[in-house]
From Swiss-Prot:
Organism: Dictyostelium discoideum (Social amoeba)
SMART domains on file: S_TKc (SM00220)
A GO biological process held by the record: adenylate cyclase-activating G protein-coupled cAMP receptor signaling pathway
Residues annotated as signal peptide: none
UniProt keyword annotation of Lyase present: no
Official protein name in the record: Dual specificity protein kinase zakA
Purpose: Positive regulator of gsk3/gskA activity required for cell pattern formation and a downstream effector of carC. The kinases, gsk3/gskA, zakA and zak2, form part of a signaling pathway that responds to extracellular cyclic AMP. The pathway has a role in transcriptional regulation; required to direct prespore/spore fates during development. ZakA negatively regulates prestalk differentiation by regulating expression of ecmB.
Entry's family note: In the N-terminal section; belongs to the protein kinase superfamily. Ser/Thr protein kinase family. In the C-terminal section; belongs to the protein kinase superfamily. TKL Tyr protein kinase family.
Reaction(s) the record says it catalyses: L-seryl-[protein] + ATP = O-phospho-L-seryl-[protein] + ADP + H(+); L-threonyl-[protein] + ATP = O-phospho-L-threonyl-[protein] + ADP + H(+); L-tyrosyl-[protein] + ATP = O-phospho-L-tyrosyl-[protein] + ADP + H(+)
Any further remark recorded for this protein: 'Zaphod' is a fictional ex-president of the galaxy with 2 heads.
Gene name as annotated: zakA
Amino acid sequence: MHYHNKDDWEEISFIGEGQYGRVIKCRKKNGFILNEQVDYVAIKIISKDKFKRNETDILEKIRLFNIPRYYSHAEDDNFIYIYMEYIEGENLANILKTKKQGRFKESRIISMIADLVETLSFLHKHHVIHRDIKTANLVLDKNKNLKLIDFGASTIQNKKQFEQYLNETTNNNNNPNNNNNNNNNNNNNNNNNNNNNNNNNNINNINNNNDLNGSGSGISTYLNEQYKQSSFAIIGTFNYMAPEVKRNYRATRKSDVWSLGCTIIEMAGGDLSQKLNGIPIIPDHLSDTLKDFLNHCLVIDPKKRSYMEELLSHKLIVHIIGPNKSKNYGVEPKFKDDDDFEEIENEKDNYLSSRFPAKFAPQYEKPKWEIEFEELEFDKDDSEGGAGNFGDVKKGLLNETEVAIKFVKKAHCEAITVCDTFYHEVLILSNLRHPNIVQFMAACIKYGEKETNHCIVSEWMSGGNLTQFLMNNHKVLENNPHLRVKLLTDIAKGILYLHKQHIIHRDLTSNNVLLDFKREILPNQLYGSNEFTAKVCDFGLSSNQSESKKLRGGSIHYMAPENLNGSPINEKSDIYSFGLLVWQMFSYAPPNTIYSPKEMASMVSDPKQNYRPQIPFNVPLKFKELITQCWDRNPLNRPKDFSIIIEKLKEIGLTYNRSSSNVSPINSPLINNNNNNYNNNHLNSLSSSLNSSPTYYAKTFGDSNSNIDVYHSADSITPIVSSPPIIKIDLTQDDWDSKLKQLDLEHENKSLISISINDNNNNNINNNNTNNNNVNDLGYC
């Protein structure tokens, strides 16, 4: 464990205090935690003799959108310091105090229930019990997102413990239940509950209004030392405690369900101290659907109480979530062996079936984007779309619109990890809208049918992926170098949008960039920037920033050194991959294809080798700087975010503009054609076809003086990135009757400049230039 150095931190404000510690808002003076720039951090300070390892274990291994992100923890001589995401917002208990009627609107309550049930269902699936669900431990951040805080009371329970608990409650409980049609049973059961409570010395002296774990800042308290570190401990807040916990039985997943019901009643303005037959009274103003949901939560007998994942399929939740609510999709946690979990290392629950148990299938409401497979038209033998890791991509029609259909191979349909990846991509795509993100249109998903085709339908991109384009059409970039800036800017804008949505792509490669062209691609043709569009695709490995800690995945040859070494993935990981894409724009081939993934991972991750592919000699200085900054070994030395990269690309684009401003008109009489038949008629005929005056602009091309680009005056010398040359004249083509020996340009300062050219025998023809300034400066990047 690291040592906490107070000198590294600036304390900003006090957040809260419990019986065993406090929470403060801090800022690290260097601004970085785990190589990630973070403005503020919430630090929970706990006395060492009261510290529970469970809390850090859970926070470290469970990463969900609705749970504050855990960074790390440290210690000094007396305390443990837990560094977590600082949430700018207020807890529900305090918000309720400001409400005139002391309650939230039902629509808002239902939305928060959906978030909370999804989060708790995921925790329970991995044997984590929160044990202190209440309004004080639910925070609305500045964007109105619900966050579940305080895992100080949480515990981890395996299956044997749960079965033992069920046996105990069966033998000791006289079958209590909350059937509203059987009030006599309820009264008898509550009498039993009261007797048990009266005999429980731990409960007798507790005031119903006091939190057993201190304040909402979340430092756990234990009533009896013998229960410490055990799910048998009576921990939590009394008014929210399940009846079995009050009777000193262990807390289980069902206990969280009861606490959830109590929390909802408080959200709705109810009084938890008012009970009927031991059950909090449900406010009359709630809808029948919400009341029915509460009746599934507030059941005295835990065996008859619903599980959290069963609540996911209640019509109240299905109506809100559907299958396209993505933000709580979590990372499979792997706990240490000493946690003594059975089968947890191999547990790969099917995410689709866990969200929608079969017995609730009739309540499923199909989202707008889900289609029937029969609605798609495509040729099964068509291979135009290509193939991927998990299936083929085919060109097809949906409602007479050209689309790309991404299939999951039937052989993969039963593989749970593939199903999760496929479904996860649908969840992400269905919520994204940006001109540089491939537009999701529909999906075909069938639950529990192995033979069903699973597919994602998106817009058809006519240009294929960037890998294919660079390998087969790199001459287009050589003749239209401004397109490099355009395509890279498109990619950067797409990734910047993802990062603003708190999504990290994690697999940014040339295969996952698709292109669209407005006209046919020909090697020697000249194109405008607006004729090319690049869009980012393939989000199967993408993750929420709060979920991405210690996630690994992606294409090895594009992965950053820190990720290969197991460090957290963040925005800087995508920036590293982008650096390799910039490099690829000049090398035209994927990086490091001569090495195996294993060799590549070793060479890149090793600080001594620190391998990167060699930058081609033809890469201009500004691009070299961008490449080396993006793939720097130290993430802190990379650009802060993609907005910085976009600005750098914009600056490179402006150099084209500045170069163009030095280009001079070529008037036909100034072209000396002493020994050939190529004359002004060629330029004049071009001008006539364009319905413009015969005035042109010249620009040298690359490092070669044998070619010259001619611009029509209609372009008005606007930036090259938006207005490319109309025609390029190659002075060495054999179809010319003879060679131009000299080309005079009228420069801005009215001096004449002559440019050396080569004849077909590569003999240099001396020039008579009197002023060669700016000629080489006009070269493209």
